[in-house]
Structure formats: structure tokens, C-alpha cells
């Protein structure tokens, strides 16, 4: 559903932020 899609998008964004902090470009 819509809520699940939003949650997945936010989770992916959060994961990207964490990855950037762990491996700075």
C-alpha cells in the first residue's frame, strides 16, 4: 500500500545516509 511504499522509501533514504557516514565520498 501507500504507507508501505513511503516506509520503504524512507528506509532506503536512511540507509543511504548511514552508508555515506560510514564511507565518506
Swiss-Prot record:
Q: Which GO terms describe its biological process?
A: defense response to bacterium
Q: Does the keyword Cytoplasm apply?
A: no
* Gene Ontology CC annotations of this record: extracellular region
**Which top-rank group of organisms is this from?**
Eukaryota
Tissue-wise, where is it found?
Expressed by the skin parotoid and/or rostral glands.
Q: What InterPro entries is this protein classified in? A: Frog_Litoria
- Taking the first listed entry, what is the main subcellular location of this protein, grouped into a coarse class? secreted
Q: Which keywords accompany this UniProt record?
A: Amphibian defense peptide, Antibiotic, Antimicrobial, Secreted
Q: One Pfam family from the UniProt entry?
A: Antimicrobial24
| Residues annotated as signal peptide | none
Give the subcellular location: Secreted
The family annotation for this protein states:
Belongs to the frog skin active peptide (FSAP) family. Caerin subfamily.
Q: What does the UniProt record say this protein does?
A: Antibacterial peptide, that adopts an alpha helical conformation which can disrupt bacterial membranes. Each caerin displays a different antimicrobial specificity.
Q: What is this protein called?
A: Caerin-2.5
Q: Tell me what organism the protein belongs to.
A: Ranoidea gilleni (Centralian tree frog)
Amino acid at each position: 500500500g501507500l504507507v508501505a511504499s513511503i516506509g520503504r522509501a524512507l528506509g532506503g533514504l536512511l540507509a543511504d545516509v548511514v552508508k555515506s557516514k560510514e564511507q565518506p565520498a
